[in-house]
From Swiss-Prot:
NCBIfam families tied to this protein: leuS_bact
EC code(s) of this entry: 6.1.1.4
Position of sequence motif 'KMSKS' region: 729-733
Reaction equation(s) it catalyzes: tRNA(Leu) + L-leucine + ATP = L-leucyl-tRNA(Leu) + AMP + diphosphate
Keywords: Aminoacyl-tRNA synthetase, ATP-binding, Cytoplasm, Ligase, Nucleotide-binding, Protein biosynthesis
Motif 'HIGH' region positions after renumbering to this chain: 40-51
Protein source organism: Flavobacterium johnsoniae (strain ATCC 17061 / DSM 2064 / JCM 8514 / BCRC 14874 / CCUG 350202 / NBRC 14942 / NCIMB 11054 / UW101)
One Gene Ontology CC term in the entry: cytosol
UniProt xrefs under Pfam families: Anticodon_1 (PF08264), tRNA-synt_1 (PF00133), tRNA-synt_1_2 (PF13603)
Protein name as annotated: Leucine--tRNA ligase
Top class in the EC scheme: ligase
Subcellular location: Cytoplasm
Length: 954
């Protein structure tokens, strides 16, 4: 009976689906375990072999926990709204709702091409997902709850004193009773102080404008990353090296009215929460740096001949007497107000130039020095000296106050700036305020082992004491105070795109109003033109039916807007991260129509025990999810402070690209081993044209592209064309994509699963090599032969031998430890060792092979199910307890001794470990092989170390 993976896998995948084998229960008496993968964007031509790596690892772990008696929730869904899905639709000339549906469910695309679909691809790999809980962020029954969460954010404010969010109605009560002078809230910087009587005298519109300065999500004009190519605003984490991560389009800075999330309110809690979760230190450090906590002082500088003041946040108030100039961010509001007429043209030109650079690019580029003098001067708070005010793009508007007091002697960037513009526009000589420190070559940035000098009342003090005294003196004269600052900025939450969640917002007198939650969802309307525009007009502006009737409480025709009972709806949509910032909670109760999840389901599942996904989400999804979770916890809707207890970032599976080499200026291709210094142009070629020996299929290559039809070739001495190989990212554009469908069709899903786990440590990057698949496939066939021969089942009821039990229990111990430690690759190695040992022992004992099938089950579930059924069991192997390790079977009773003569090993002999040296010597001396080696001689000395060596000398 031969191993037939295709037949076996189809059978068991059907069984699992029909019997809902992996359905989790919300009211189980078993302990819970929630295992989650980051859900995919259904945005392209399906999965390649790199995509399932994390899914396979989580599936192995989920199946293992079921064997251990846990009620396991292991769901899957699709992050189907947002830029990735929309860009794919644009590139293929289709509508995003159509491509999203086909990419998930399969079907025929616009050009008549059959698309397998993510769901079918995932099913073929044999995952233990609870598909009854599937979510799609673009389904109205899902984004209804995303809209509901947005409304909760809008109707909340953050109290600094209590460190949590509260309902906005409580803030209104405070305003009515005592005004806002004593309110400790996270709010806009420019809030006006008012009394209770003044509040009561304000109109409703005035009150709403004030409340917008406190709400957790708010509308404000902000400096944003605008991408004309994508026609939308991007978050900082969506930009790489000054271009959009998606599509590589240039990004510029621009002021726009946008919805923003007040994530900055949670900065300290986000920071402290990292101490309570089991995440890699590298991810934690990324978030710490992104949050960017710094302790220092807020210093106020008056501007000479102006009523304006410049506020500066500094971590070094001890260096206040070393200030020689000030630098504002080019986007700073004061720039236009204080720039002199003489400098106006130069300043405006500089601002236009820097608008083309992203904040990340400006932060990273420490070598380029640029700036312009504004013509204005600030006044030193203590010495009253005039300090020239410059603008420079190394200062960011969103960090701190967007202004720095430049102390060249203590900061490298200030030092470089001062030297670069030395002697220009009042740029002063660098002042040295550090005793016994040479700054002739570089700034002195250390805070340690230095004494402050040339600094009036700070002279002779160290960093700590000088900082405290400087803050005290600044507070005394009313020009500063101690302050903790965070680099983390509020997150822009608007996108000028079509394919996203509509905001549940309409406008009255230009002010946002929330649609009552009972009327959700507000469904994304159909529009004839959904493409983004370079001028930023959102596609929903083209919608014929996109206005809100407050009497009928429904969406009506846009041309009915009268601003009396029918009002315009918000034209922007939410960003891609909206739906992914809470999705793990929806899986807990996916069919609840009234709330995103019931209190009972939330109380049972709590949060995710194991989360697996890419490290590229460190400062995006993983931060936004923590923010939303903490907010929902504050409002009583989430049971825990953190969403994900343990996080593992799987490494990337890299492709092995194939290269052909064309002689420069010709259409002749030379085999890699015949290049010999000739000028060649390397060209990537489809890896499917190349066999495991790196030999190119000439016919397929010539038929691939028209310009290759007439190609000529210089072969090696064996008449073959050998390609070059290089390990690179797996990508369609590199022609090195291998799909799981191909592997499953040829070798089976169990082979794919085992091979991906066998490639190397889960968290490391590793190259894909299809040639290695055959070895894993051979292992499964060898496993099968322990149970079957050509005539059928050969499992017997023989008592297992000591060696049988030893092989099994070594494997039980190793596999259980490896899965708990996520060392999946070494488990596969142990399986191979075990099967080899049992094969050489000619073991067919049921007592060994039944537990072996269970051990293999998390990794290769289809073959394990078939073996289990063939052994006579009627239930799924997934319901069976994991084998228990018994140490007694690993106790060594015998030792295979190497027997040496004059230090050279000649043979081995197996003896009981409890023998004395004298007993060992007696047995060895009587052995025929010893007699043959000695040839009648008597050894001068017999060296025996029990349990280690036997050596006969002389």
């Amino acid at each position: 009976m031969k191993y037939n993976p295709n037949e076996i896998e189809a059978k068991w995948q059907k069984y699992w689906a029909e019997n809902q084998t992996f359905a989790a229960k919300n009211n189980s008496e078993k302990p819970k375990h929630y295992v989650l993968d980051m859900f995919p964007y259904p945005s392209g031509a399906g999965l390649h072999v790199g995509h399932p790596l994390g899914y396979i690892a989580s599936d192995v772990y989920s199946r293992f926990k079921r064997h251990q008696g846990f009620n396991v929730l292991h769901p899957m869904g699709y992050d189907s709204f947002g830029l990735p899905a929309e860009q794919y639709a644009i590139q293929t000339g289709q509508r995003p709702e159509d491509t999203t549906r086909v990419n998930i469910d399969g079907g025929v695309d616009k050009e008549g091409k059959q698309i397998a679909g993510y769901r079918k691809q995932l099913d073929k790999i044999g995952f233990s997902f609870d598909w009854a809980r599937e979510v799609r962020t673009s389904n109205p029954d899902y984004y209804k709850h995303t809209q509901w969460i947005f409304i909760q954010l809008f109707n909340s404010w953050y109290c600094r004193k209590q460190g949590k969010a509260f309902d906005i109605s409580e803030l209104v009560t405070v305003f009515e009773e005592s005004g806002n002078a004593l309110v400790e809230a996270v709010c806009d910087d420019n809030v006006t102080i008012f009394t209770a009587d003044e509040w009561k005298s304000y109109s409703d519109d005035q009150k709403e404008k004030i409340l917008l300065q406190y709400r957790m999500t708010y509308l404000a004009e902000t400096e944003v990353n605008w991408c004309p190519g994508l026609g939308t605003v991007l978050a900082n984490d969506e930009i790489v090296n000054g271009v959009s991560e998606r599509g590589g389009f240039p990004v510029i800075r621009k002021k726009m009215t946008q919805w923003s999330m007040r994530i900055s309110a949670y900065a300290e809690r986000l920071l402290q929460g990292l101490n309570d979760i089991d995440w890699s230190e590298s991810i934690k450090e990324s978030q710490r740096n992104w949050i960017g906590k710094s302790v220092g002082a807020l210093v106020t500088f008056n501007v000479k001949n102006h009523d304006e003041v410049i506020e500066v946040f500094t971590t070094r108030p001890d260096t206040i007497f070393g200030v020689t100039f000030m630098t504002l961010a080019p986007e700073h509001d004061l720039v236009a107000k204080i720039t002199t007429p003489e400098q106006k043209e130069a300043v405006e030109a500089y601002i236009e130039k820097t608008a083309k650079r992203s904040e990340r690019e400006r932060m990273a580029d420490v070598k380029t020095i640029s700036g312009v003098f504004t013509g204005a001067y600030a006044e030193h708070p203590f010495t009253k000296e005039a300090i020239p005010v410059w603008i420079g793009d190394y200062v960011l508007a969103g960090y701190g106050t967007g202004a720095v007091m430049a102390v060249p002697c203590g900061d490298e960037r200030d030092y470089a700036f001062a030297n670069f513009f030395k002697g220009q526009n009042g740029m002063q000589e660098i002042k040295n305020i550090f005793a016994n420190v040479d700054i002739s070559e570089a700034a002195y940035g250390s805070k340690d082992n230095v004494e402050i000098a040339a600094s009036d009342f700070l002279n002779g003090l160290n960093y700590k004491d000088a900082t405290a005294k400087a803050i005290y003196k600044l507070e005394e004269i009313g020009q500063g105070k101690g302050k903790t600052n965070y680099r983390l900025r509020d997150a822009v939450f608007s996108r000028q795109r079509y394919w996203g969640e509509p905001f549940p917002v309409y406008y009255v007198n230009g002010l946002p109003k929330m649609i009552d939650t009972q009327h959700l969802p507000i469904i994304l309307p159909e529009v004839e033109k959904y493409l983004p525009t370079e001028d930023g007009l959102p596609p929903l502006g083209n919608a014929a039916v996109w206005a809100w009737d407050i009497k009928e409480n429904k969406v009506v025709n846009t041309d009915l807007v009268d601003n009396v009972s029918i009002f315009p709806l918000e034209l922007n949509t939410m960003p891609g991260w909206a739906g992914s910032s809470w999705y793990w909670m929806r899986y807990m109760d996916a069919h609840n129509e009234n709330e995103f999840a019931s209190k009972e389901a939330l109380a049972y599942w709590e949060n995710v025990d194991l989360y697996i996904g890419g490290s590229e989400h460190a400062t995006g999804h993983l931060l936004y999810s923590r923010f939303w979770n903490k907010f929902l916890k504050d409002k009583g809707f989430a049971p825990t402070e953190e969403p994900f207890k343990k996080l593992i970032n799987q490494g990337m599976i890299l492709g092995t690209t194939a290269y052909v080499y064309r002689l420069e200026g010709t259409n002749t291709f030379v085999s890699k081993n015949k290049i010999k210094g000739q000028n060649v142009q390397p060209i990537r070629v489809d890896v499917h044209f190349v066999n495991s020996s790196d030999e190119l299929n000439i016919e397929k290559f010539k038929a691939w592209r028209e310009d290759f039809n007439t190609a000529e070739f210089i072969f090696d001495e064996n008449g073959k064309y050998i390609v070059g190989r290089e390990v690179e990212k797996m990508s369609k554009s590199y022609y090195n994509v291998v799909t799981p469908d191909d592997i499953c069709a040829e070798y089976g899903a169990d082979t794919l699963r085992l091979y991906e786990m066998f490639l190397g440590p889960l968290e490391q990057a590793k190259p894909w090599n299809t040639a290695g698949i055959s070895g894993v496939f051979g292992f499964l066939k060898k496993l099968w032969r322990l149970y079957f021969d050509d005539n059928g089942l050969i499992v017997n009821n023989d008592e297992p031998t000591k060696d049988n039990l030893k092989s099994l229990h070594k494997t039980i111990k190793k596999v259980a430890e490896d899965i708990e430690n996520f060392s999946f690759n070494t488990s596969v190695s142990q399986f191979m060792i075990c099967v080899n040992e049992l094969s050489s022992q000619n073991c067919h004992s049921r007592a060994i092979l039944e537990p072996l099938a269970i051990l293999v089950s998390p990794y290769a579930p289809h073959i394990a199910e078939e073996l289990w059924a063939q052994l006579g069991h009627k239930t799924s192997i997934s319901e069976v307890a994991f084998p228990v390790f018994d140490a007694k079977h690993l106790v060594e009773t015998n030792k295979e001794y190497p027997v040496s003569f004059n230090g050279k090993m000649r043979f081995t002999i197996e003896l009981p470990l409890d023998l004395t040296a004298a007993q060992i010597e007696e047995i060895v001396m009587k052995d025929e092989r010893t007699q043959k080696q000695l040839d009648g001689r008597i050894p001068n000395k017999v060296i025996i170390v029990p349990g280690k060596i036997i050596n006969l000398v002389g």
